[in-house]
Amino acid sequence: MGKEVMVSDYGDDDGEDAGGGDEYRIPEWEIGLPNGDDLTPLSQYLVPSILALAFSMIPERSRTIHDVNRASQITLSSLRSSTNASSVMEEVVDRVESSVPGSDPKKQKKSDGGEAAAVEDSTAEEGDSGPEDASGKTSKRPRLVWTPQLHKRFVDVVAHLGIKNAVPKTIMQLMNVEGLTRENVASHLQKYRLYLKRIQGLTTEEDPYSSSDQLFSSTPVPPQSFQDGGGSNGKLGVPVPVPSMVPIPGYGNQMGMQGYYQQYSNHGNESNQYMMQQNKFGTMVTYPSVGGGDVNDK
């Protein structure tokens, strides 16, 4: 852009630099460079407005740091609201599924893999056999067997929560039984609610799960099960944490489970016989399908 010139001292007869050389090297970098007034300001558009209008070019408004901060706050607020809405929606779905008669929780999808999980109760009858695969081996799925001990634990948890506050997800967490799924609890809770209505005489409709009455009648119904808040006088208490379950090695296709019953806080109701007992869990049994098919594939 510029150039350097050597200025000699013409008064020196020897032709040597009077000042020793570099002192007389004059930089001319600024010669010919535009000044600040000659430069195009950054706020000015490079394309003239008339030309932009001819090509339908609409100039965008320049963004400031305040615009960036405002957009960031709006994005964070929308993310927080969507997270809260999803958690509230999950709780509402749990209550609707457990309270509406005729709803089929078996058609719900598992949250981890998104695959449909068909779960059959112990009172379901053996179905027709399905086709075998190419290797001649039939697929096997675990089926939950609701034993009287496991049903007793279910009844105690429902009595603690109250029949109106009991939802499948909370019951599953308080029961703390290894291998028990939300679909198992939702199906059993629906049948148990119909059973309670029948023994109270609140409904005359036919029970499609009449085969479960023998299991339900094996355990007395606690009086607090009919209350809104169960044994907590309308308020959900904080239960004592349950010890982790220890699976027992089984034989063949059987899996054993054993643990200790949780002692719930009863808020003054110390004589409640359903809250202070120790209990054993039922067993999770993997039944082979009869005739080469899976009973869940009906």
Swiss-Prot record:
Organism whose genome encodes this protein: Arabidopsis thaliana (Mouse-ear cress)
Where is it localised? Nucleus
Going by the entry's taxonomy, the superkingdom of the source organism is recorded as Eukaryota
Task: Give me the stretches of Polar residues compositional bias.
Answer: 209-227
Spell out the InterPro entries in the cross-references: Homeodomain-like_sf (IPR009057), LUX/BOA-like (IPR044841), Myb_dom (IPR017930), Myb_dom_plants (IPR006447), SANT/Myb (IPR001005)
Instruction: List all Basic and acidic residues biased stretches.
Output: 104-113
Principal subcellular localisation of the protein: nucleus
Which region ranges are annotated with the description Disordered?
A: 1-26, 79-143, 206-232
Sorted alphabetically, the keyword list is: Biological rhythms, DNA-binding, Nucleus, Transcription, Transcription regulation
In alphabetical order, the GO MF annotations are:
DNA binding; DNA-binding transcription factor activity
PROSITE patterns linked: HTH_MYB
Q: What is this protein called?
A: Transcription factor BOA
